Regions:
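Conserved non-catalytic scaffold segment of RNase H-like nuclease domains
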Residues: 1-113, 127-149
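Short, glycine/acidic-enriched loop or turn micro-motifs at the edges of active sites
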Residues: 14-16, 120, 157
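A short, structured active-site edge motif that brings together acidic residues
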Residues: 113-125
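Acidic two-metal-ion nuclease catalytic site recognized across multiple nuclease folds
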Residues: 162-229
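Active-site catalytic microenvironments for nucleophilic, acid-base chemistry
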Residues: 103-106, 124, 140, 164-168, ...
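Acidic, divalent-metal-coordinating active-site segment for phosphoryl/phosphodiester hydrolysis
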Residues: 150-163
């Protein structure tokens, strides 16, 4: 089993945690072939809902920046095409992978890849007491680290972190650096019916509850999750 010399490093910024509930706000990808960066991809994404304040503080991405950006369904095809058949790489790659698989399924597309998780490698090769977030790991391994919490710079940082760890630890650990099959189960989200929207609207009014996202931006699945609570 060989370590990967070619892959696509990916980082997403999102409105929160959980691919079934939250939305993508930014995509950054770095294509690496035979160890060298050959291409990059970057876009902001309109999540179709307000970005929470604490997320804006973390990422610097606000509603104004994304209001004219494409929706995820407009770019998921080119994201998949950019990746080709290469494995994907990221710091906690299942987070990003889950969002992309969900977006693909919603667009009646398939996105199935093997992947490399730099966070798992950090857990293997760093002392337990060391912080293992992307910035801390890059500092520990003397890998270049640009502005944290923007998608393209974080994707580049994950790539450089992988290369730095590989230089130090590849010998005898080939299997740890090899891409593994990623599995994320996603179901296509149903379009919300007018009846569902009205039912939720009436429920919220009756219970005097305010939603943080517009009802019109919610899928049928999301409305069901709220009304079932």
């Amino acid at each position: 089993v060989n370590a990967a010399d070619s892959y696509v490093a990916i980082d997403l910024e999102t409105t929160g945690i959980g691919a079934k509930r939250e939305r993508i706000t930014e995509i950054g990808m770095v294509k690496v072939e035979n160890g060298a960066v050959t291409d990059t991809y970057h876009t902001l994404v309109n999540p179709g809902r307000p970005i929470p304040e604490h997320i804006t503080e973390l990422t610097g991405i606000d509603d104004d920046m994304v209001k004219d950006a494409p929706m995820i369904q407009d770019v998921i095809g080119e994201v998949i095409a950019f990746c080709g058949t290469l494995p994907v790489l990221g710091h906690q790659i299942m987070f990003d992978y889950g969002f992309l698989v969900q977006a693909a399924v919603n667009g009646k597309l398939r996105f199935e890849r093997s992947g490399i998780d730099t966070l798992k490698l950090c857990r293997k090769f760093m002392p337990p007491e060391e912080k293992k977030n992307l910035a801390a790991a890059c500092a520990y391994f003397h890998a270049a680290q640009d502005t944290a919490h923007r998608a393209l710079s974080d994707a580049m940082a994950a790539h450089e972190l992988y290369q730095a760890m590989k230089r130090l630890h590849l010998s005898g650990n080939e299997d740890a650096f090899a891409p593994k099959v990623l599995q994320y189960k996603a179901k296509k989200e149903r379009q919300a019916t007018q009846r569902q929207k009205q039912h939720l609207h009436d429920l919220l009014k009756y219970h005097k509850i305010e939603l943080t996202v517009p009802i019109d931006s919610m899928s049928g699945n999301e409305i069901s999750r709220v009304t079932d609570r």
